[in-house]
């Protein structure tokens, strides 16, 4: 990790320095593991008592928490956001090789922009267009007539099927598959007949997609992922789904076909969302949410029974299974009381 003077780091972060600005910072760490040459952050005042035992050389925090800090500090309004910027400055992610590996297979009919990097054993088919400074990791497959915008990076073993469009400055982690056939079949007297998926996948700018996520191509229209969307690992996005700008999707989410999700939504991990319906803008669904109906009002939504000791859970489940009968008995009692 690169080293930097605390005063220089503060200047880049628009932070106020309190303490020794000449302190050399060599890394970022959590509050419980940070060493004197490292910097940490306090984003929630509930944990300010941890400052007393923290061994970090410096802490990023708010003005309100500064009196509790015994070492150098960078004072900011939003410590967590500042931590994100600080991590970008001190990022240790290896830079890709600025070349095309000899073992890469690139069609003569593909178009590569300036500064494109292609890793070992990658395959780029005819009609592909790669913008400037695109990085294609080792073992990637880029299907015919796919377009990838400038500055986007695919880590190793990403598969992009034919005619997919990916915008600028996107990041796609290893094992992800984009543009595979959607789950489209017709039934003819008990026999399943495959419906070729004639649409594609269009992904906007600044989209980040985690490892081993699958985004299916549309049946007729395109599957669309808006600008600034972030999708975690192992998500399934079915054909013709539309996800609005700046929505966040946590790990293990399943979205059924033709679902439309609005902008600025947050979908909690392991949620399952029915297809052929809409979720409006600014909806938050907590983890393991099961969404069976459209959501038309912004807000926080939850479903399911939180974890309980098994004996208590069995009783709760029994009550839920018998809720209709309990409701009928309650109404009968109410009618009896009304008559009296």
UniProtKB/Swiss-Prot annotation:
Catalytic activities: a UDP-3-O-[(3R)-3-hydroxyacyl]-alpha-D-glucosamine + a (3R)-hydroxyacyl-[ACP] = a UDP-2-N,3-O-bis[(3R)-3-hydroxyacyl]-alpha-D-glucosamine + holo-[ACP] + H(+); UDP-3-O-[(3R)-3-hydroxytetradecanoyl]-alpha-D-glucosamine + (3R)-hydroxytetradecanoyl-[ACP] = UDP-2-N,3-O-bis[(3R)-3-hydroxytetradecanoyl]-alpha-D-glucosamine + holo-[ACP] + H(+)
PROSITE patterns found in the cross-reference section: HEXAPEP_TRANSFERASES
Pfam families referenced in this protein's UniProt entry, alphabetically: Hexapep (PF00132), LpxD (PF04613)
Active site: 239
Pathway per the UniProt entry: Glycolipid biosynthesis; lipid IV(A) biosynthesis; lipid IV(A) from (3R)-3-hydroxytetradecanoyl-[acyl-carrier-protein] and UDP-N-acetyl-alpha-D-glucosamine: step 3/6
InterPro entries: Hexapep, Hexapep_transf_CS, LpxD, Trimer_LpxA-like_sf, UDP_GlcNAc_AcTrfase_non-rep
Any GO CC annotation of this UniProt entry: membrane
Record carries keyword Lipid metabolism: yes
Uppermost EC category: transferase
Biological processes annotated in GO: lipid A biosynthetic process
EC number annotated for this UniProt entry: 2.3.1.191
Keyword field: Acyltransferase, Lipid A biosynthesis, Lipid biosynthesis, Lipid metabolism, Repeat, Transferase
Entry keyword annotation includes Transferase: yes
GO molecular function, one term: N-acyltransferase activity
Subunit details: Homotrimer.
HAMAP family for this protein: LpxD
Protein function: Catalyzes the N-acylation of UDP-3-O-(hydroxytetradecanoyl)glucosamine using 3-hydroxytetradecanoyl-ACP as the acyl donor. Is involved in the biosynthesis of lipid A, a phosphorylated glycolipid that anchors the lipopolysaccharide to the outer membrane of the cell.
Family: Belongs to the transferase hexapeptide repeat family. LpxD subfamily.
Alphabetized PANTHER family for the sequence: UDP-3-O-ACYLGLUCOSAMINE N-ACYLTRANSFERASE (PTHR43378), UDP-3-O-ACYLGLUCOSAMINE N-ACYLTRANSFERASE 1, MITOCHONDRIAL-RELATED (PTHR43378:SF2)
NCBIfam families to which the protein is assigned, alphabetical: lipid_A_lpxD, PRK00892.1
Protein name stated in the entry: UDP-3-O-(3-hydroxymyristoyl)glucosamine N-acyltransferase
The encoding gene: lpxD
């Amino acid at each position: 990790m690169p080293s930097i003077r605390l005063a220089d780091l503060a200047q880049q972060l628009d932070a106020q320095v309190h303490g020794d600005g000449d302190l050399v910072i060599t890394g970022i760490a959590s509050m419980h593991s940070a060493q004197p040459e490292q910097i940490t952050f306090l984003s929630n005042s509930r944990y300010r008592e941890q400052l007393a035992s923290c061994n970090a050389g410096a802490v990023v925090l708010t003005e309100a928490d500064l009196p509790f800090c015994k070492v150098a500090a960078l004072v900011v309004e939003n410590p967590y956001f500042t931590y994100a910027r600080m991590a970008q400055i001190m990022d240790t992610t290896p830079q890709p090789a600025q070349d095309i590996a000899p073992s890469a297979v690139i069609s003569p009919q593909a178009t590569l922009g300036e500064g494109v990097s292609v890793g070992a054993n990658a395959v780029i088919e005819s009609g592909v267009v790669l913008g400037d400074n695109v990085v294609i990791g080792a073992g990637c497959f880029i299907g015919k007539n796919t377009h990838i915008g400038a500055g986007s990076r695919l880590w190793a073993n990403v598969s992009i099927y034919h005619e997919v469009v990916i915008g600028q400055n996107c990041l796609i982690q290893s094992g992800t598959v984009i543009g595979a056939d959607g789950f489209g079949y017709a039934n003819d007297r008990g026999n399943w007949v495959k419906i070729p998926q004639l649409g594609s996948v269009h992904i906007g700018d600044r989209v980040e997609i985690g490892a081993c996520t699958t985004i299916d191509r549309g049946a007729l229209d395109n599957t669309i992922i808006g600008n600034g969307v972030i999708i975690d690992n192992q998500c399934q996005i079915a054909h013709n789904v539309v996800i609005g700008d700046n929505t966040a999707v946590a790990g293990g989410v399943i979205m059924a076909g033709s679902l439309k999700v609005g902008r600025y939504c947050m979908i909690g991990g392991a949620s399952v969302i029915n297809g052929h319906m809409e979720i409006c803008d600014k909806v938050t669904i907590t983890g393991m949410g099961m969404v069976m109906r459209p959501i038309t009002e912004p807000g926080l939504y939850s479903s399911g029974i939180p974890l309980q000791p098994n004996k208590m859970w069995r009783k709760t489940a029994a009550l839920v299974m018998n809720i209709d009968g309990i409701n009928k008995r309650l109404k009968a009692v109410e009618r009896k009381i009304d008559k009296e």
